């Protein structure tokens, strides 16, 4: 058993960290586990057996599972693009104080639409639960839930700016360079994997609790954003003499950290139950190779989340789940700080004096994401003793502000709606196959280019996902 566990974990870890994806509620998936995903991520308050992986969503729910293994694999397809409008500046100078010859180079993205490549990603999970004395359970769940990936090919994307080349003092026009930031192929690659180990127990027949530590590991790489080198803290601190070495085009960097999760379940009546689950902020080591990009010298913690749910047995065959999930993206500075913070970096001509507002500084720019609240509705219909059908819908206002669309070309987390369905079929040997499908309708966010306010940028994405799981 120890060898099986070690081998399974190693395979899952390698798959999770080699499979970046841009997830669906911000940069988190719409749920964890095949059965829950088929109901739009609901089930926090349900005592139905949805597999050992449900302990990752609410640790208390492990008491309702058998002693079982569960493995699953999703194939996730995010189809993302951006579209830039025409510009009146076309990379020219923005007058700040013309009387004193103070100008800011604009950055104009070449008008037109560009699609990101890399549209298929595998996302695995594995979970196990064991019975202990006094109706208690020990469980572990290893899963990928967070991540983002964009890949903008320089062969069909470009930008024009004096940041790219040319000297206005001698009458040169601004240069046009490849990539959306005129620094070659651009994009980010973030993978996050989680290991949750939980102890859960019942108190009487109508109450259960669970808690345990969460270990996380993440990998990150960025490319094609060297245009922002003059706005980094290290460049400003050097007096403009030393370009940053931890901003872009380095290899994948890794980061690890710990947090905790806890959950409750309450059987209110024979047909109504409720659940509550909390995951703390997971404090991660800094990405040293990207200390000039992320606020607080490369810090990229994983935000906390709070989930609550009600579950109703409408009949012997039909269960209805109502869930809500709150994710505190703004608590993580590298995610929540607005892009406008960089405008007060001393290297830009706006009179800023604080190095901490430059990229990589303690108050450096992030992606400007708001916190996100997602409302979910799920249905579980047991057609017969061997087949259970599931359906779901969720809505959450996307976290990106219009003013921050330029940076969010790298991380266009704009999805709001998810439509899901799935099936669990029992097998003759005591196992069960589960399937889920998710469709996220196309959503766009449009806002001004912060370095060329005569231009607008439209971020667009839609998504598909198919997942299969097996418990035994």
Language-model segments: which ranges?
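Gram-negative bacterial Sec-dependent N-terminal signal peptides
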Residues: 1-22
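Alpha-helical transmembrane segments and their juxtamembrane interfaces
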Residues: 12-13, 68, 383
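Outer-membrane beta-barrel porins/channels
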Residues: 22-36, 121-472
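Short hydrophobic/aromatic segments of transmembrane alpha-helices and their interfaces
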Residues: 5-6, 36, 44-45, 190-191
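Intrinsic disorder/low-complexity segments enriched in polar/small residues
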Residues: 3, 88-90, 464-468
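N-terminal, post-signal peptide beta-strand-biased segments of exported outer-membrane/organellar beta-barrel
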Residues: 19-144, 410-415
């Amino acid at each position: 058993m120890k060898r099986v566990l070690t081998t399974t974990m190693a395979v899952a870890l390698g798959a999770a960290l080699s499979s970046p994806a841009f997830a669906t509620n911000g940069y988190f998936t719409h749920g964890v586990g095949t059965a829950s995903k088929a109901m739009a991520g609901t089930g926090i308050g349900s005592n139905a057996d949805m597999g050992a992986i449900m302990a990752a969503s609410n640790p208390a729910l492990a008491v309702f599972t058998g002693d079982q293994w569960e493995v699953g694999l999703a194939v996730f397809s995010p189809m993302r693009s951006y579209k830039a409008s025409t510009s009146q500046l076309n990379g020219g100078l923005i007058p700040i104080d013309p009387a004193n010859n103070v100008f800011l180079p604009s950055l104009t993205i070449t008008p037109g639409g560009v699609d990101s490549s890399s549209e298929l990603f595998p996302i695995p999970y594995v979970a196990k639960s064991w019975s202990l004395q006094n109706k208690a359970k020990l469980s572990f769940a290893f899963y990928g839930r967070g991540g983002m990936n964009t890949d903008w090919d320089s062969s069909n994307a470009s930008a024009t700016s004096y940041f790219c080349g040319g000297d206005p003092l001698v009458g040169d026009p601004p240069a046009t360079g490849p990539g959306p930031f005129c620094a070659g192929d651009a994009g980010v690659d973030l993978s996050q994997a989680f290991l949750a180990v939980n102890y859960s127990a019942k108190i009487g027949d109508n109450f259960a609790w669970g808690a345990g530590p969460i270990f996380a590991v993440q990998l990150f790489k960025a490319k094609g954003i060297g245009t922002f080198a003059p706005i980094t803290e290290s460049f400003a601190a050097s007096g403009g003499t030393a370009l940053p070495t931890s901003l872009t085009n380095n290899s994948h960097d890794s980061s690890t950290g710990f947090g905790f999760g806890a959950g409750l379940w309450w059987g209110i009546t024979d047909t109504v139950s409720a659940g509550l689950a909390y995951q703390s902020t997971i404090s991660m080591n800094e990405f040293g190779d990207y200390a000039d990009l992320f606020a607080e010298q490369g810090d990229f913690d994983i935000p906390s989340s709070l989930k609550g749910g009600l579950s109703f047995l409408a009949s012997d065959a039909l269960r209805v789940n109502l869930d809500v999930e709150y994710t505190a993206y703004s608590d993580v500075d590298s995610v929540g700080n607005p892009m406008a913070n960089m405008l007060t970096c001393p290297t830009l001509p706006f009179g800023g004096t604080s190095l901490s507002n430059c990229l990589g500084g303690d108050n450096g720019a992030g992606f400007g994401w708001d916190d996100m609240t997602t409302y979910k509705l799920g249905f579980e219909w047991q057609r017969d003793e061997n087949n259970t059908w599931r359906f779901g819908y969720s809505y959450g206002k996307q976290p990106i502000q219009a003013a921050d669309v330029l940076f969010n070309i790298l991380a266009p987390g704009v999805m709001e709606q998810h439509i899901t369905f799935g099936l669990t079929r029992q097998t003759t040997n005591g196992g069960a196959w589960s399937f889920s499908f998710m469709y996220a309708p196309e959503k766009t966010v449009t806002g001004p280019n912060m370095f060329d306010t005569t231009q607008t940028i439209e971020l667009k994405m839609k998504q598909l996902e198919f997942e299969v799981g097996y418990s035994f």
